[in-house]
Curated annotation (Swiss-Prot):
Pathway: Polyol metabolism; glycerol degradation via glycerol kinase pathway; sn-glycerol 3-phosphate from glycerol: step 1/1. Glycerol binds at residues 84-85, 136, 246-247. This is Glycerol kinase. GO terms for biological process: glycerol catabolic process; glycerol metabolic process; glycerol-3-phosphate metabolic process. Its EC number is 2.7.1.30. Homotetramer and homodimer (in equilibrium). Heterodimer with EIIA-Glc. Binds 1 zinc ion per glycerol kinase EIIA-Glc dimer. The zinc ion is important for dimerization. CDD domains: FGGY_EcGK_like (cd07786). It catalyses: glycerol + ATP = sn-glycerol 3-phosphate + ADP + H(+).
Length: 502
């Protein structure tokens, strides 16, 4: 009898590293998770220690196998999914980072972005990389590191330094420095990659003065990139066979592989992606054109809207405001009041993402009167997640010409029934919540499993996808539009708050 085989997905997120073991029926067998430190050197700056990312991720891998009581030779393949855009530069020789990882949320490169705009590069960047000029993406972060770490640019030119997003860093560590790769989805988030030619963009490298020698090789999202030797029982060499940025992995995990299918992930931020097939749709409404995974991990395109603060705004209620002791409490308190009593919370703590793209917006609470209590503020914070999602969906429908009939949802916050119902109410659209919540890990597992023949094709996976609950709109159109217009007014007042030259 042959031993039962499994797939392991490594899900390296913004606040924690996770490892998930899945069986052939796409059931979750075991999960391990470790949080790691968020470093805030200055207001608006966010960093991670790359060695801590690696330590937390590698320990979850060992832990999850022990929990599931399986040996490494029972693993058919490993898939990796990761927080995107976060930039790491390290020494080829030692594997030691020359600076902390600059996280996607970090706004320190706003000045570099302003310079790119002044130099008239916005259209070039949008047309060729699919992105808008914003500190969010990796390119300006790499430039910042090379500008600020003495001698680093010369070392990079000599091939002594390497750049990677988190997937690249993990694979480098897992293969003891033998493999320096990324996939198309992660490359498409750097602002250095031409999404039409599917190669690094020479003009962008030139503009940001980033030596090509430090960049990884770019490959498909579903293929064998290299082998890793896991300790634990057996010490077998296991193929690393899938890579996708977290949002593209979630899109694949939701099996949104046909044109016009969309999902929204509610994590630290909120990310809506709509598959546009083999056509790169240029957005006229502040969305990104990005690379997604087709049915067998090949290049498809997608429209994406990124909201920076979703789950993070609930953490703010918990950690900074001390209004709740646990994120799960937010639903309980939000339903203690019948509405927000006219309050809107705009959680623009690090600026606003799609479709506004204003790095100078700041968080604000509007509509406060004497009768407002903490429950109203908690409810308004939850509602802000749904309003921001509607902002993105309206832009997406305008760009694609596709009217969405159902939105597939995933991520931590989808367990909040109040939020999901309000989301359906404010969109006027069905919201579908899947049985398996770990769709980001699922996507990485699917990509890896398909690459090694663990699963034959998507048809085999389709029957495993079960919708656990469907939410339908429960308010009238006039009420929906009235509430949304209040949100739009609040957003306008929060914009352009911070001074540019500070």
């Amino acid at each position: 009898m042959t031993e039962k085989k499994y797939i392991v997905a490594l899900d390296q997120g913004t606040t924690s590293s996770r490892a998930v073991v899945m069986d052939h029926d796409a059931n979750i067998v075991s999960v391990s998770q470790r949080e790691f430190e968020q470093i805030y050197p200055k207001p608006g700056w966010v960093e991670h220690d790359p060695m801590e990312i690696w330590a937390s991720q590698s320990s979850t891998l060992v832990e999850v196998l022990a929990k599931a009581d399986i040996s490494s030779d029972q693993i058919a393949a490993i898939g990796i999914t990761n927080q995107r855009e976060t930039a790491i530069v390290w020494e080829r020789e030692t594997g030691k980072p020359i600076y902390n990882a600059i996280v996607w949320q970090c706004r320190r490169t706003a000045d570099i972005c302003e310079q790119l705009k002044r130099n008239g590069l916005e259209d070039y960047i949008r047309d060729n990389t699919g992105l808008v000029v914003d500190p969010y993406f990796s390119g300006t972060k790499v430039k910042w590191i090379l500008d600020h770490v003495e001698g680093s640019r010369e070392r990079a030119k000599r091939g002594e330094l390497l750049f990677g997003t988190v997937d690249t860093w993990l694979i480098w560590k897992m293969t003891q420095g033998r493999v320096h790769v990324t996939d198309y989805t992660n490359a498409s988030r750097t602002m250095l990659f031409n999404i039409h030619d599917l190669d690094w963009d020479e003009k962008m490298l030139d503009v940001l003065d980033i030596p090509r020698a430090m960049l990884p090789q770019v490959r498909k999202s579903s293929e064998v990139y290299g082998q890793t030797n896991i300790g634990g029982k057996g010490g077998t060499r296991i193929p690393i066979a899938g890579i996708a940025g977290d949002q593209q992995a979630a899109l694949f995990g939701q099996l949104c592989v046909k044109e016009g299918m969309a999902k929204n992930t509610y994590g630290t931020g909120c990310f809506m992606l709509m598959n546009t097939g083999e056509k790169a749709v240029k957005s006229e409404n502040g969305l990104l054109t990005t690379i997604a995974c087709g049915p067998s991990g090949e290049v498809n395109y997608a429209l994406e809207g990124a909201v920076f603060m979703a789950g993070a705004s609930i953490q703010w209620l918990r950690d900074e405001m001390k209004l709740i002791s646990d994120a799960f409490d937010s639903e309980y308190f939000a339903t203690k009041v019948k509405d927000t009593n006219g309050v809107y919370v705009v959680p623009a703590f690090t600026g606003l993402g799609a479709p506004y793209w204003d790095p100078y917006a700041r968080g604000a609470i509007f509509g406060l009167t004497r009768g407002v209590n903490s429950n109203h503020i908690i409810r308004a914070t939850l509602e802000s997640i749904a309003y921001q999602t509607r902002d993105v969906l309206e832009a997406m429908q305008a760009d694609s010409g596709i009217r969405l009939h159902a939105l597939r949802v995933d991520g931590g916050a989808v367990a909040n029934n109040f939020l999901m119902q309000f989301q359906s109410d404010i969109l006027g659209t069905r919201v579908e919540r899947p049985e398996v919540r770990e769709v980001t890990a699922l996507g990485a597992a699917y990509l890896a499993g398909l690459a090694v023949g663990y699963w034959q094709n998507l048809d085999e996976l389709q029957e495993k996808a079960v919708i656990e609950r469907e939410f339908r709109p429960g308010i009238e159109t006039t009420e929906r539009n009235y509430r949304y217009s209040g949100w739009k007014k609040a957003v306008q007042r929060a914009m352009a708050w911070e001074e540019h030259d500070k």
